[in-house]
Amino acid sequence: SVKLNEEGSYGDIITNLVISFELPDISSLLTTGGRKVRYSNSIGISLFETVELYIGGNMIDRQTPEMIDILSETHFNTHIRNNFDNLVGKFETDDFDENTNTSGRFYLPLQFWFCRTNVDKQFNLPMFLLYNDLIELRCKMKTFNQVVTNADFNTTDSLGTTLQISNPNIIVEYILLDEKERKRMLELSMKETQFFLINQVQKIQVSVPANSGSFKIELKQLKYLITQLFWIYKSDNKVASGRHLNYNYNDSNPLNTVQITFEKQDATDKQDANYFVLVEPYLNKLNNPRKYIHTFSFSIDPKMLEQPNGVCNFSEIHNPEIDISFVDNVPVGTLQIYAINYNVLQIRNGKGVLFHNL
């Protein structure tokens, strides 16, 4: 847990957060079965289970490794994506290379709504207005045995030794306001509530049995104004062998067809699953992901966060469903569905509350 506005903070507005840490050198280590090891692909992301933002003791948003990975694949242009790959130790394939990802300092740029200045420069977190609330990051991490892998992805081996990260820190990008502007905004927030448009992420996860064929997944737990849906499949075996952000099956798409329905009416035609990997991103000004990341947008330009340009109010839809069929012989795994929604952070007298609670 890290407090962002404790005594000694340096600025008024937060625009970026980056987690930085060093990992010990494992290039000379062997597993209990005698295999050489390296850290998992995208170790800078994979090491984490969740990163949560709290204001005044209330969770405002939660980041998962999968969602950060999805945004880096779809919302970043090629140059930014390549730089991001270098920061987190990301490679296009999981093929084992004993000379990569065995040590070093890694950086994880978080992707909360105010951290996406490489996509949209309009958002920020006005820390100076939240003087009566604690702003806090809470991180949950995996064990090292979960993020160290070997050449043949054997799942019965273990390291047989204890590893530890070192020199962790949070890099915070602050903006300093002119004293007159700061005073004016503080006085205004004491007189009337200030409203700030934000994004949040919602998640649905369902178990996928082996040879599951097809099934419908209810989306009724999703709420409010949603701009975009993403969904991915992860096999349990790949997760167990340290391939946490691998969404394929036999190097191809594990999904066969997809259809979205609202109240028994077709919201989309039944499409080949690759339509949502290749065509939907093209139509909605997103990058084509290098992985089997499926997306459907209700927005004309989902990267334009500061100006809503198309949403779907899931609170008003009684029976939203997604109908998915899988290719033959897909193993046991999970299907994760993510939704990006709008919300409003209300600030008055130094305290912040959400307009809608998830």
Regions found by a protein language model. Name each.
Residues S1-L358:
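Short, low-complexity Pro/Thr/Gly
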